[in-house]
Amino acid sequence: MSLQRLTALRALMASQPTALAAYIVPTADAHNSEYIAPVDARREWVSGFTGSAGTAVVTASQALVWTDGRYYTQFEKEADLSLWTLMKQSLPDTPNMEKWLTSNLLEGAVVGVDPHTITREEWTPLQTALLKANMQLVPVPRNLVDEARRQLGDAPPARPCNPPAPLPVHYTGMKSGQKIAMLREKMAEKKASAFIVTALDEVAYTLNLRGSDIQYNPVFFSYLIIRPTSVVLFHGTGDVENSVSEHLQKEGLVGFEAKCYDEVVPYLHSMAQELSEKGDGRHSIWLSSDASEAVHRAASGADVVKKPLSLISEVSPVALMKLIKNERELEGFRQCHIRDGVAVVRFFKWLHDQINLGATITEIQAADKLVEFRKDEADFMGPSFETIPGAGANGAIIHYSPSRGGEQTVIHKDDMFLLDSGGQYRDGTTDITRTRHMGQPTAEQRDAFTRVLKGQMMVGSALFPKGVKGNVLDSFARHSLWEVGLDYAHGTGHGVGHFLNVHEGPSGMSWRPYPDDPGLKPGQILSNEPGFYKVGDFGIRHEDLVEIIAVTKDTDHPKASGLVGDFDGRGVVGFNTLTLVPNQRKCIDVSMLTDFELCYINAYHKRVLETLGPILQQRGLLEDLHWLQQECEPIFRK
C-alpha cells in the first residue's frame, strides 16, 4: 500500500511545471495544530506512521521521516522499513532536514511544499539553506498528497464543520469583549492595522467558544481577524448559530462579522489592497510567526500589490494571554482535578480487583472503563487525548496507541502497567500518568520507578526565580536517572490549556529552550512528567499537572520556610501539584529516598486522602475509600 502511494506522489512531483526533486509532507494542518483532523493526516496516509509529530520528505528514490524520541519504536512498528527511513531528530548524529536536503540533492534542485502546511518560521530558514546550496524552495498550492489520494480513489474525508458552543464567563473569568479590547491595545502599541489569529485554540480562547472539529481538542476550524472597529470570524459557510451571536453580544463584542472559512485568503488579499492603496506606509499586519507561509503571503499582499505591506511576525499575544490563567480558570483547574482524581482512583481500584480475580482485561477495555468513571464526574466533556494504556513492553512505547482491530493485549498480573490519560472538563483540562505493577515488581523496576519519582519530586518541590525559562528545570527531573547512566527521550513538561489543548505553548520544560518561552510565572499550568523506558520490557512515567505559584516564607510550600531572599527582587516561584492520585507504595524503594523526599511523598498522599476521601465517603463508595486509605498509608523506613 505504501509503495502504491509513494509511486502516485512521485508521479505528481515529476509532473509539476518545474519537476520537484523533493516534496515535504509536514504533520501540521493549516493552523499548525499538533493534533489534526483525518482530512489533514497526510503524512500518516503516505507513510503509515501515526505519531503526532514528524515530517516526511519524499524524493525520486528515498522516503524519510524525521521524528523525536517519543516515536522511534512506534515508527519502526508502523512504517514499511523497506521503503521508509527513520531520521532520529533528537540525536546529535542525525542531520536535520535542511542539512540532508542540501547534502543529498543535486545543485539546482527544486523542493516543494504546500504553503498552508508550513509556518513562516519553518519556511524562512529552509529557504535560506536551499538558496545557499543553489537550490529552490517553491510553494505548491494544490496539496500533492490530496491529489494522490484522489487519483487512487481514496479522496480525503470532508473537513469537519461542527457548530461551536459558548463557554460562559463563570468558567472563563473574562468576557470575549474584554479580551478583544486588550488585544486592540496591544495592536495600537505595535501600530498594527489588523491582527490575524490562526491557531485554533487561540480563536476559541478569544471568543470564549469551544468546538468539536478535532478529536480530544475543543476547537473548531476557523480564522479570526481583529481590526480597529471589526472582528471577522472565518468558519464553515459563514453562518453562525443564534446561540453564538447572542453569546458574543452578551460578552460585549461589537462589529462582529462571520464569513466562509475558505474566504480567508481572498479577504487578506482584499485587505492588503485596501491598506496599500492608502499609500501612507503606516499599515502593518500582525500575525504569529507560527502562522502558515500561505497566510503570511496573503496578509502582506505579496501576490496582489506592488509594494507588500510590512508584517509583524512574532509570538501571538493571544498565546501569551491564555498562558497565564486568571483566578476563575485556576479555580476550575483545581476543582476538575479533584473530580478527575476520584475517577482515576476508582478506576485503579477496579482494575486491581479484576486482575486479582483472574479476569481478562485488555488495554482497550481498561481505557474504555476509565472513560466510564470520568463520565460520572460533573462537567466531563470527553478525554483530552487518546488514552495510552501500556501493559508490559507496550509501556516502553512513549506515545503508545493500541489498535481496536486485531489481537488485543491483555494486562497480566506480572505486568508493569503505564496509564497516561486525561479529561476535558468545562472548568479545566487534566493530564495524568500513573504506573502501577499488577503484581510484585522486580528490584530493577522498583529502582527505576523510584528514580523517576525522585526526579518528579525534585521538580515539584523546586523554588526558582520568577521568569526563568523552563529548560533550566529539566535536568532536575533527570538527576537521579543520570546518576546511573539512564535517561528518557522526551521533555519533562508542557503547558496545558483551560478546557483547550492538552499541549499548550509557548512554555514548557525540556532539555532545549522553547523558542518563544516568556519565562515561568504564576498562573501557568504545566505538566511534570519524567519517565524511564526499557524497550521490550516495561515503561515508567509519573505525571502530575502543576500550577506555578508565587512563594514567600509564609506560603504553604515544603521549602518556603527556608527562604532568605527573593532573587534580588525578581520574586520566588514554585509549583503546587494539582493532580490527586497516589503513587504505588510497593513500587517505591524507600531506601533510595532522602528524609525530605519521604516526608514529601507522605504529605502528598495525606493531601490526596484528605481531599478525595470525604467525597468517596459522601457518595457511599466505601470500597473505593478503603482502597484509597490503604494506598495513602504513610511510608516508613524499615
Descriptions of predicted regions:
Residues M1-K638:
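Active-site neighborhoods and metal-handling regions in enzymes and metal-associated proteins
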